Amino acid sequence: MAAVAAASAELLIIGWYIFRVLLQVFLECCIYWVGFAFRNPPGTQPIARSEVFRYSLQKLAYTVSRTGRQVLGERRQRAPN
């Protein structure tokens, strides 16, 4: 059972790193497409990527770490504000 828990936690960590790499590549190459949903209307300030995605990445990191703690049997923590 411990081997299954360790493998699950390892897969979560690997998945998290793959997600981060894909997100970074997406932001670097695709955020300036004309039809991109997060693009600001003409004449407005450009989007600060750190502001747009910071909260969602924090929540995702919390969810991944919480799932890992649950798999390993550690106690839970509160989500970041």
From Swiss-Prot:
A Gene Ontology biological process term: protein lipoylation
Instruction: Report keywords, A-Z.
Output: Developmental protein
> Any keyword DNA-binding?
no
Would you say which domain of life the source belongs to? Answer: Eukaryota
Report the protein's function. Answer: May participate in the maintenance of segment identity in the hindbrain and pituitary development, and maturation or maintenance of the overall structure of the nervous system. May function as a regulatory subunit of ion channels.
Question: What PANTHER family does this protein's entry cite?
Answer: NEURONATIN (PTHR15285:SF0)
Of which family is this protein a member? Answer: Belongs to the neuronatin family.
The protein, known as: Neuronatin
